[in-house]
Every structure is written in structure tokens, then in C-alpha cells.
Swiss-Prot record:
The keyword Lipid metabolism does not apply. InterPro entries: DNA_clamp_sf. It comes from African swine fever virus (isolate Tick/South Africa/Pretoriuskop Pr4/1996). Interacts with host IRF3. Induction: Expressed in the late phase of the viral replicative cycle. GO terms for biological process: symbiont-mediated suppression of host cytoplasmic pattern recognition receptor signaling pathway via inhibition of IRF3 activity. Keywords: Host-virus interaction, Inhibition of host innate immune response by virus, Inhibition of host IRF3 by virus, Inhibition of host RLR pathway by virus, Late protein, Viral immunoevasion. The keyword Nuclease does not apply. This is Uncharacterized protein E301R. SUPFAM superfamilies: DNA clamp. Plays a role in the inhibition of host innate immune system by acting as a negatively regulator of type I interferon production. Mechanistically, interacts with and prevents host IRF3 nuclear localization to inhibit its transcriptional activity. The lineage of its organism: Viruses, Varidnaviria, Bamfordvirae, Nucleocytoviricota, Pokkesviricetes. Belongs to the asfivirus E301R family.
Length: 301
């Protein structure tokens, strides 16, 4: 059968020409003189995925911190056991400007509806906050194929800061992250399956590793009932690393319900998991310029 017959009648699909956007990073002054914040980025779907994650976690209000170098989103999940901190470094976007450090409060459900209408036809998002309209955040989406701009005016507020949530940022500082004794990577599918399967039998699971080049273990045991043991023998397959001394054992117990809800909410394929001695867990993932951190506290079990 010829290629023409296989293709069928009609014109071949038109190849989409994608503009080449330069990522200039941080600007010394805004493009628009009235701007307190300007953020221009050629990957709007990153924001859509971020707010899908907030929705999956049933987050309510979101704190937004703008600084001269980055924009950060803070929120909690419905259980209040997990804290979400998502940061975009201004140097990794098309252009970024913020005059100073300031906070905005936005309603997740309101912004989520806006992002639900955004598809792949929109190739750029621009976010603007102006001195003359401090109660409004402008979201501008651009479709270059038909030269269309869609602008949303979202009401924002000067929020009451959640200091316990903001304090969690110390857990993901560069210096602190160096000291986590155990870390590995799962795909979102692996994470979801492991904790979904475990939830059928137990509320707590033990994460354990001996010092040195040894496997990672996840297990539980119910006396006179059932036990289960999951072992990861090849450290390279899950990018397993640790700083545990050879003579020591790292062991923590975590509540499965917290991890299961996070696993079901994930919007990235790869998740890096970091463990502290006190049982706190950090789930890290990246989406282009966005670094997404979710901290689950063991003392909330």
C-alpha cells in the first residue's frame, strides 16, 4: 500500500512554527513602568500542572512571595500534614522583575478555573502586578498562531502570613539538603503503587537502610497476621544515595495515608525522596524552571 493511501484524503497536517523565545532572566527595570512585578514565561502549562497539584491536595489559600530574584508559592494540603513550596528562579524565565519583597494571597479555586482553560495553543504567560492596582494580579496568555491575548484580572489580597508554613522553607535550604542522610528517586507510578498496596494492610511502614552499599528496605509486620518486605537491591536504578556510616542503621516509621495522598496528587513523572533522622520526608520534583518541594512532618503522625 502506498504512503499516499495510508495517509488518506485531505491535506497533510500543517507544521506548527514555534517562536524562539529568549530567556533574558532578571531585569533591572520593568518593561511596563507601572509594574511592581513582571513575569514572562514561555511554558504556561507548568502553572496549570502546579495548580492541578494544589487541587489534588485540596489546598485552599496560596501565599505568593515575590522577591527581586524569584517567585515562590506556599500552601498546605487538606490534612495540614504536608507543606508545599514551589519556586521559580527569575533567571530561568523569559524576563522577570520584582521591585522588592512583597506577599500576595490568592484563592486556589479561582485561579484553578483560569488555568483549566489554558491549552497548548498558548505559548506564553505574563503575570503583572501594578502599583496603581494593588488589589489585582493580571494574567496574560498569548496564542501566537492567531496573535491573540487573553487577559484575566484576579483579585488578590495582602495576606495574613502563615509563619509555620513559611518556616518550612528552612527544611529545603541548600545547606540543610546536604545533610539529609538518605535519598532516592521513584517514578510517580512506583510511588503510587507502593503506598497504595501498603495501605491495604497497615497504617505505618518502616523505611530502613544499613550504612554502606546496601539495599533500601520498606516493610511492615503485623504479629500473628501478615508481614511484607520490599527491597531495592540496585542503588543505581533508583539513584539511591546515603551518608549513613557503615556501622549504623537508618530507620524511620511513616504514616502511609500521608504519602498515599501525595502520591495520588503528583503531576511529575520523577520524584526525589529525602529522609531526615526525625522522620520528616521531602518530595522534590522539577518542571522546567519550577522546583516543587513537599515537606511531610513525622511529628504530625
Amino acid at each position: 500500500m502506498s504512503e499516499d493511501i495510508r495517509r488518506g484524503p485531505g491535506r497533510p497536517p500543517k507544521k506548527r512554527v514555534v517562536p524562539n523565545f529568549e530567556r533574558k532572566g532578571i531585569l533591572e527595570k520593568p518593561v511596563r513602568p507601572q509594574s511592581r512585578l513582571e513575569f514572562s514565561y514561555d511554558n504556561p502549562l507548568i502553572f496549570k500542572n502546579l495548580f492541578i497539584y494544589f487541587k489534588n491536595l485540596k489546598s485552599k489559600n496560596i501565599l505568593v512571595r515575590c522577591t527581586p530574584t524569584e517567585i515562590t508559592f506556599f500552601s498546605r494540603d487538606q490534612s495540614q500534614a504536608s507543606f508545599v513550596i514551589a519556586t521559580i528562579d527569575g533567571k530561568n524565565v523569559n524576563h522577570y522583575y520584582a521591585s522588592d519583597v512583597f506577599w500576595l494571597g490568592i484563592n486556589r479555586e479561582l485561579v484553578e478555573k483560569m488555568f483549566n482553560s489554558i491549552d497548548r495553543s498558548f505559548l506564553k504567560i505574563t503575570i503583572v502586578h501594578r502599583y496603581d492596582k494593588p488589589e489585582t494580579l493580571f494574567f496574560i496568555f498569548t496564542d501566537f498562531d492567531i496573535d491573540k491575548e487573553c487577559t484575566y484580572h484576579i483579585t488578590v489580597s495582602e495576606p495574613e502570613l502563615d509563619m509555620d508554613l513559611i518556616e518550612m522553607e528552612k527544611s529545603i535550604s541548600e545547606e540543610r539538603l546536604k545533610n539529609y542522610p538518605l535519598r532516592w528517586e521513584f517514578t510517580s507510578k512506583q510511588l503510587k503503587k507502593t503506598f497504595s498496596d501498603l495501605s491495604n494492610y497497615t497504617e505505618l511502614v518502616t523505611i530502613e537502610k544499613l550504612g554502606g552499599d546496601t539495599p533500601l528496605h520498606l516493610y511492615f509486620q503485623k504479629f500473628n497476621s501478615i508481614s511484607y518486605h520490599e527491597m531495592y537491591k540496585s542503588s543505581n536504578k533508583i539513584n539511591l544515595t546515603s551518608t549513613i556510616p557503615k556501622s549504623q542503621v537508618f530507620q524511620i516509621n511513616v504514616k502511609i495515608a500521608h504519602i498515599k495522598s501525595l502520591a495520588s496528587a503528583m503531576v511529575t513523572d520523577k520524584i526525589r525522596i529525602l529522609c531526615e533522622e526525625n522522620g520528616n520526608l521531602i518530595f522534590q520534583s522539577e518542571m522546567d524552571a519550577l522546583m516543587l518541594n513537599t515537606i511531610t512532618l513525622n511529628n504530625m503522625i
